[in-house]
Amino acid sequence: MGSFSVWHWLIVLVIVLVLFGRGKIPELMGDVAKGIKSFKKGMADEDQTPPPADANANAKTVDHKADEIK
């Protein structure tokens, strides 16, 4: 009752093949693989990006004396 038998999986496979067709499933898997590769490349690029040399070098400060409210 708790687990699926071979017949259950066979029926699910047939339904998936009917809905998506034989040509659509490899195309879908290829798109998933491209997404995974792109994600891994993005994660690797993020690790290789060096931090800025001095974060405060480009920062500008503004000194302003607030006027008193009467």
From Swiss-Prot:
Recorded coiled-coil stretches: none
Keyword field contains Protein transport: yes
Subcellular location: Cell inner membrane
Record-linked Pfam families: TatA_B_E
Ranges of compositional bias, category Basic and acidic residues: 61-70
Molecular function GO terms recorded: protein transmembrane transporter activity
Annotated region described as Disordered, given as residue ranges: 42-70
Keywords: Cell inner membrane, Cell membrane, Membrane, Protein transport, Translocation, Transmembrane, Transmembrane helix, Transport
GO CC, one annotated term: TAT protein transport complex
Domain of life: Bacteria
Chain ranges passing through the membrane: 1-21
Biological process, per Gene Ontology: protein transport by the Tat complex
Entry annotated with the keyword Transcription regulation: no
Membrane topology, record value: Single-pass membrane protein
Quaternary context: The Tat system comprises two distinct complexes: a TatABC complex, containing multiple copies of TatA, TatB and TatC subunits, and a separate TatA complex, containing only TatA subunits. Substrates initially bind to the TatABC complex, which probably triggers association of the separate TatA complex to form the active translocon.
PANTHER family assigned to the protein according to its UniProt record, in alphabetical order: SEC-INDEPENDENT PROTEIN TRANSLOCASE PROTEIN TATA
Protein task: Part of the twin-arginine translocation (Tat) system that transports large folded proteins containing a characteristic twin-arginine motif in their signal peptide across membranes. TatA could form the protein-conducting channel of the Tat system.
Family of the protein in this entry: Belongs to the TatA/E family.
Protein name: Sec-independent protein translocase protein TatA
Gene name of the encoded protein: tatA
